[in-house]
Amino acid sequence: MSKKIFLLFFTLFTFSLKVPAYDFENAGIYYTVSSRQKYTVAVTSSPQQRSAYRGEIVVPPSVVYEGKTFRVTEISKRAFQGCAQLVSLTVPASVVEIGDSAFFACTGLKYLVLEDGEKPLRVGSNSYHGVSAGQAIFHDCPLETLYLGRELQYEGGFFYGYSPFYKKKELSLVVVGDGVRTLENRAFYGCESLESVTIGGRVASVGNFAFYACKMLKELVVKEGNLPLEIGTNGNGKNLFSDAPLETLYLGRDLHYPESVGEIYNPFFQKGTLRTVTIGESAREIGSHAFQGCHSLVSFTVGSGVDRIGDRAFSGCISLREFFFKDGEGTLFLGVNRHSTSSKGEALFFDCPIETLYLGRTLDYSTSYFDGYAPFYDQQYLQSVVVGEEVVSLGDRLFWGCHSLSTVTIGGAVEFIGNYVFKECTALTEVVFRDGELPLYVGYNKFSPNGIGEPLFSDSHLHSLYLGRTLTYNMSRFYGLSPFYQQTELSSVTVSDYVMQLSQNIFYNCSALTELVIPGSVSVIDNAAFLGCTSLKKLELKDGRAPLSLGYNLFSEMEGRTLFHDTAVETLYLGRNLQFLLGEEYGGAPFSRMKKLRSVEVGDEVRVIPDDLFKNCPVLESFVVGKAVETIGNRAFQGCGNLSRLVFRDGEKPLLLGYNVHEPSGLGRSLFYDNPIQQLYLGRELRYPDTIYYGYAPFYRKETLTEVTIGEGVSVVGDRLFYGCTQLDNLQIEGTLSVVGAYAFYGCPAKE
């Protein structure tokens, strides 16, 4: 009888293995109904068991059965047992339990996705041994890639195999999603092939031994989060990542780790493999000694939320060449590398051979001798600095002694540059002040109470300058007169539309400067701005409606000097109405006595050419008058003995001309009396004092004049305008003259 019962039991057991129970199938996945009241189902094994589940399986969050929607809440025990051809599995957030041995003998399962979910996922084990080591749920699976979007709950003891991913030696990539709060002890213990781990922003803690023996872990990403991340250790005086040869780190949050003597639990202390570090936006502090001894560290980026970097944070970082402070509004306090009570200290980056720096933060630091003066003091390898748009000040001595520094870009929000900032920056050739609306105050290199001090860039050999700001500074000789004083190699200067004023002495003795364009935004060019600019040959004052106030070079009761006295300007574009002090003590009008000026073009915003403006410019050959000029003052071209080409551009309003010499008792001299004009284009009606005392008319007896074109818009030619122009044999009248004054063309061969 007992033998019959045993045979019956064996037959039933065998049948149960071969033909698992299920209620329905949907899209190749088999289900049993867990609860008809709650409308829940569980994934179960297939009738074919070892062959049904293969390739990629995506478990849906819900299925339709008998016309009703059931939530998938469970993967049953042994559901995928023996499915050796199952390669990829995705488990939805609706699943809250995975039964024991669910993946027994799934020897092909490489890719696992546990989708994001708020509820924990309870997982069983592969086998339980009460007297020896058990096996975790994925023991038989050669997992390579894992997305963990759920909090896992499991028996973590020795008899259950510690953790679901314990000693997964093929696992190379892990991403922990935002649904996870905790990575338990030994979470990835012994994952010898693990190369990259991403930890979600809501993970609050990582337990002890979580990455023990992860000997290939090179990349770690800790995403931004609202709370610090508490991390454990590897035990025996070792930090959590002591076994990991990390090379790349993204740290989006502050880390908290157990306090210790000698920083042994600091996770990155003396991490000699680390090469690249980025601190994310949720981190607030880089602690003391944080990256001390990371001798292979090459590049470091500090997030905008960091407000403090502690002492010795980069001590021994002897390969650190790139440093980036991301743009941020707040002030960032920096510690030191070594404070000394009796000798010169060491600044924070003393050990770092930084070559490239992006500074997006305003820095607060000690300028004391005992703290090494400034964080980048004496950075011998620093070549390039860019200061971002959130920085408002550059403190004293910031780049003192950076002998290799060649280019500096200063953001448009900087309002203050302290003293000695670029002292001994002997390789500095290019400076860019980015566009900014507010004036920028700049300090000096040396104050000298008994002589000329040293300006901010006195130790540099500038070649190129972009000036996007109005600069203010102490103009006294005791402070070096101006930041660019005696920059004798400065050959290229660009002034932007944000500049309102060129202050006193600004380009004093910039003897290599050859051309300059001054935008229409500039309203003042102060005294001695171009003193000693002996190579300046081309000057363009761009169009602007507001008048431009010009200073002078030298005030002297005997004989002053005009603003452009020292220049060698040959070509001038004048797009502005000018205001200036007219008198011999100021040297006269700003463009008078310009001995090399050959060509002048007056733009269409100019209304007035003042008295004496181009007086005594002996080589001036060509002059173009803009269409909006309404008045040309007296003596404007007196002494211009080479002016042969004159153009009055087409304009609607008449143009009033002054005179050259007024003789109250005899024949005066008209405006162009001194000028041997040969070619004339007349696009305007001219008005002038038509009396003997002023020389009758502007071209009266102009015997050099050979060619005249009268534009289409001109209908009136005044009295005696071309009287006695005996060489005028080429006269073109493009329009119709309705009024021709008395003797207008008297003696002109072309008229005859």
Question: Which role fits each region the language model picked out?
Answer:
Residues 16-23:
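Boundary at the C-terminal end of the N-terminal hydrophobic targeting segment
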Residues 5-13:
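Sec-dependent N-terminal signal peptides
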Residues 36-38, 52-74, 84-97, 107-127, ...:
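Structural signature of tandem-repeat unit edges
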Residues 1-2:
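N-terminal secretory signal peptides that target proteins for export/translocation
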Residues 259-263, 371, 479, 585-586:
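Extracellular beta-sheet repeat scaffolds used for adhesion and glycan interaction
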Residues 23-49:
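GGW-centered surface loops in extracellular recognition modules
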Residues 77-79, 99-102, 135-137, 163-164, ...:
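Consensus positions within tandem repeat domains that build extended binding/scaffold surfaces
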